[in-house]
Amino acid sequence: MAWNEPGNNNGNNGRDNDPWGNNNRGGQRPGGRDQGPPDLDEVFNKLSQKLGGKFGKKGGGGSSIGGGGGAIGFGVIAIIAIAVWIFAGFYTIGEAERGVVLRLGKYDRIVDPGLNWRPRFIDEYEAVNVQAIRSLRASGLMLTKDENVVTVAMDVQYRVADPYKYLYRVTNADDSLRQATDSALRAVIGDSLMDSILTSGRQQIRQSTQETLNQIIDSYDMGLVIVDVNFQSARPPEQVKDAFDDAIAAREDEERFIREAEAYKNEILPKATGRAERLKKEAQGYNERVTNEALGQVAQFEKLLPEYQAAPGVTRDRLYIDAMEEVYTNTSKVLIDSESSGNLLYLPIDKLAGQEGQTDTKRKSKSSSTYDHIQLESERTQEETSNTQSRSTGTRQGRY
């Protein structure tokens, strides 16, 4: 054998040696300490010496045989080296990563996640995470459109879409994106008013910044995709911060007053509309009632006119009596004897006559029959006049 079998002294004073001439009893030195793994070059050298020595001594020490044994030893060493080189070429790409492979320094391909192999010392690779969301922050003092200075901060979230372009299209893609973000933000802020930046225009500024940033990175073709842009803060310089806070508070009060006024309008407008409709309907009803009453009075006087023409005195007296009755019905009445020099005589006519409601009912019934009484009086007068004329005619005829 090329080395001693266990238990075979073979002139080694009872020591068991491994192929490299080390003591094989428990893998320890005589002192009892662990020897540790040997150096790879030292292993190859010792193995070559052992194999060369064994094969060189074979056949009585012939030079040709010794030369063949050395070649075999070097072949074994080469096979071991190749095996080590092959195993060293295996590598693993993570699930969220992609590997960019360079062959002799030149881009060759992109490998997918999993176990891959490359020829060691010929191909090199670099793994890039293409699923992680990365973030960078841009901030600083910026000049607005109305020549004011404002401090703005914005966060940009992005991810890698093309690993090769991310690594080799520009020198440093992250730094290039930071500069592009700062440039886009300054361009948008420079085209906006300070009041809009601090209050209502934040959403518009965020959208405009994202659109401008996409245009810039598309022109650079860096292999990055913008996921989101967040407008973190915008504040005026400390020297004028109090004045801007007052302006913002006044604007908020204005908006609050407007909302309260709108709420009051929404509350009172339906009520006012309903009241207006009610008053309009009442006015229409009053108009119809007054018109009908006037038309009734006109019709009544039109019917009364022939009677008045037939008996003016009687009709006039009757109208006067009805009018006075209507007037005195709604007034308090006191009777006083003005010629008496004694005590004042007070007669409560209203209480004596009864309730005022009964008087009103009586007045209304009398008023409604006024025309009938006048017509009867007129007919009676006409009859008396006719009888008088007949008697006068008979008297004159008797005389003749």
From Swiss-Prot:
InterPro entries: Band7/mec-2_domain, Band_7, Band_7/SPFH_dom_sf, HflK, Membrane_HflK_N, Stomatin_HflK_fam
Regions of compositional bias (Basic and acidic residues) in chain numbering: 374-383
Composition bias, Polar residues: 384-400
Protein localization: Membrane
Keywords: Membrane, Transmembrane, Transmembrane helix
Membrane topology of this protein: Single-pass membrane protein
Biased composition (Low complexity): 1-27
Pfam families, sorted: Band_7, HflK_N
Cellular component, GO, one term: membrane
Region (Disordered): 1-43, 355-400
Membrane-crossing segments per the record: 70-90
Function: HflC and HflK could encode or regulate a protease.
Membership in a protein family: Belongs to the band 7/mec-2 family. HflK subfamily.
Subunit note: HflC and HflK may interact to form a multimeric complex.
Protein name: Protein HflK
Organism: Vibrio parahaemolyticus serotype O3:K6 (strain RIMD 2210633)
